[in-house]
């Protein structure tokens, strides 16, 4: 069984991420979308890592060979634990390539059995990031072209709670 891992922060998962997930899912027997926890950023995200995993599970529910998980270990070690042979990485721009190749080389030093494959972003998602989606949501923009419909209300509600907290209002 060929298992691949698509690591990222996914705060939140976007339609660009989902596009990569769907394309990668047809290439592997099993695809694990793994929320990577950066200890330096653990309290700075919109959603907790556990909430992100739950959002991803809802979004990929109809993809039978895709699952969501969370890890705070090195991705190369996590891949070894899961017996994964491949990391999936999305590239939005040429500028992403240099950093991702460096990371791929480091990961293969840690886990020589691990390859990295790159999926170029679909043209309509090259500009899209979780940060862009969150910023648009803060200003009540239509999110249909940015986020999976299953999670739009979650993002809006979370931002509303954050806004209330910043304004000193209680919910």
Task: Identify the meaning behind each predicted range.
Residues 1-171:
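Nucleotidyltransferase catalytic core that binds NTPs
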């Amino acid at each position: 069984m060929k298992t691949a891992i698509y690591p990222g922060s996914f705060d939140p998962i976007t339609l660009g991420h989902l596009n990569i997930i769907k394309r990668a899912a047809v290439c592997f027997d099993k695809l694990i979308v793994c929320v990577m926890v950066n200890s330096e950023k653990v309290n700075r995200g919109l959603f907790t890592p556990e909430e992100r995993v739950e959002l991803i599970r809802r979004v990929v529910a109809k993809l039978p060979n895709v699952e969501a998980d969370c890890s705070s270990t090195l991705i190369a070690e996590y891949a070894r634990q899961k017996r994964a042979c491949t990391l999936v990485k999305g590239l939005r721009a040429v500028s992403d390539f240099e950093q991702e190749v460096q990371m791929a080389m480091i990961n293969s030093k840690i886990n020589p059995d691990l390859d990295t494959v790159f999926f170029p972003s679909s043209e309509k998602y090259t500009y899209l990031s979780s940060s862009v989606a969150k910023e648009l949501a803060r200003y009540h923009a239509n999110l249909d072209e940015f986020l999976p419909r299953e999670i739009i209300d979650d993002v809006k509600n979370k931002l509303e709670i954050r806004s209330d907290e910043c304004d000193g209002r209680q919910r």
